[in-house]
Amino acid sequence: MNLKEFESVLNQPANIRYEYFVKKVVDSETVWGLYEDGWAVTKDDNGNVLFPIWPKREFAEHCANNDWENYLGESMDLYEFIDDLLPRLKVDGLKPSIFFNNDDSAVLDVDILIRDLKAELEKY
């Protein structure tokens, strides 16, 4: 990915980045998070714990700063993500934070993300 594409996608509104995320992770069958002795998590202004995820390593590592400065991009298989990790997040009360750009992200219920990923998978 060239710098122009990277910056263009990164500067889109959260809802557009969410659509990009769904298409890219289904196409690559890979989801990216930040990892260092455990996955990176954060909290929103209401104290809800969020699990940040990205469509590509470059976007994840762009956010590896401040509390996450020693974290590295780590990939997850899309099917394990859908079948194992997302249900675990739901049980634990975490919400996915999709495509954080150091400013905002799309925060959705787990069930909505699963629905959207499965709908996109049906196109393949």
Where are these regions (language model features)?
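Conserved NAD+-utilizing ADP-ribose enzyme module
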Residues: M1-Y124
